[in-house]
Swiss-Prot record:
Membrane topology: Multi-pass membrane protein
Inducers of expression: Induced by sulfoacetate.
Lineage: Bacteria, Pseudomonadati, Pseudomonadota, Betaproteobacteria, Burkholderiales
Function: May transport sulfoacetate into the cell.
Record-linked PANTHER family: FI19708P1-RELATED (PTHR11662:SF399), SOLUTE CARRIER FAMILY 17 (PTHR11662)
Cellular component, GO annotation: plasma membrane
Keyword Membrane listed: yes
Record family assignment: Belongs to the major facilitator superfamily.
Annotated organism of origin: Cupriavidus necator (strain ATCC 17699 / DSM 428 / KCTC 22496 / NCIMB 10442 / H16 / Stanier 337) (Ralstonia eutropha)
Disulfide bonds: none
Name recorded for this polypeptide: Probable sulfoacetate transporter SauU
Keywords annotated in UniProt: Cell membrane, Membrane, Transmembrane, Transmembrane helix, Transport
GO molecular function: transmembrane transporter activity
Cellular compartment(s): Cell membrane
Amino acid sequence: MKQRIKTRHMILGVMCLMYFIAYIDRVNISVAAPLIREEMGLTTSQLGLVFSAFAYPYAAMQILGGWMADKFGPKKVLIVLSLIWGVATVLTGFAGSVLILVVLRFVLGIGEGGAFPTATRAFTYWMPVAERGFAQGITHSFARLGGAITPPVVLVIVAAAGWREAFIVLGAVSLGWTLLYAFFFKDSPDKHSRVTAQELQEIGYRHGDSRQAAKAATPWRRLFRRMWLVTFVDFCYGWSLWVYLTWLPSYLKEARGFDLKQLALFTALPLMAGVVGDTLGGVLSDRIYKRTGNLRLARGAVLFVGLAGSLMFIAPMTFTADAVNAVILLSLSFFFLELTNAVLWSLPLDIAGKYAGTAGGMMNTGFGVAGMVSPVVFGYLIERTGSYDLPFMISGALLGVGALASLFINPLLTVDSPDEKAGEVRHALP
């Protein structure tokens, strides 16, 4: 007899598709950037401004989007957000000036800003504790897969029609996902007609949990105390990630001499390495937890190894003269960087439980702030020095600081547990 696919895994599949599409819409501007820059006559500083315009509302929407998901449910919130970013992507194809580009990237940031915290809130009630690392890992691996296929997809559409048409097509795909999500997703398992009593037991969901959470007051002070260090580490992680998402195609073209045809392959390689890292990081963390029962070790070990490993490969990349070797080192660095992503997104679930949407938004504010600063600083330093070396060195330094800070993160210090009893709650999970 054929085994029935669990509803939670189908929900996970829908979320994977959202992460995949969201990253295509986020990264497409960097792939089209050389053509946009040529058509509109933009400087590197102006291009950096276009890149960073996304990050300001993205950061601002993190906590707000997560809080709205906690209060109003992830279904309504994510439908509105995906409509906003889908329309913004379509309209980018009609932009005629740098100002319009900045405005539309800003609107895109509003739409995408609350999406991942909202998804994290959904996982609180749809995914059991032992599957959360995998869920965060696989969704973010689909995000990186979206980023990895963006160069060839965008360049194929560009070759056939133009860069404007690429944004119109990709925006239409985003709006199509909104329809799928609105049809299939429910805020909690007990509301879904396909979920069996056995699966409810496997998930560990109790009837009324989501309604009680919506009525509960948000413990802002305790959330901040538990999440500020996670937010800082996410900033250190995000600084380097934004470099990959915004400047990688320009770096490979201008500093390493790859032509447009080669860019499709060599831009995708580091991002594909990230796909593997994302998935493996979540699986490793879950496996360590299942074998040891030590949640702090399961999260902390993967965080430290990922950030330190990324630094280990980004440092020699700046000194190698061979372009292919540089891509290999970038790919290895990005693989280790992405090992940390699933763990970072699992921490709000571990620490905050029913407030995971707000906590996830709080954490990802660090990522958003990095997105405000990193692309602009990167572009400014390139313009001032004529080289990409110093910006990459700054990224490496932040990876080192983040690795050290990760050693002090303790997911056993939950929002509901007093500090003095943290040592007694080794197995306590939300």
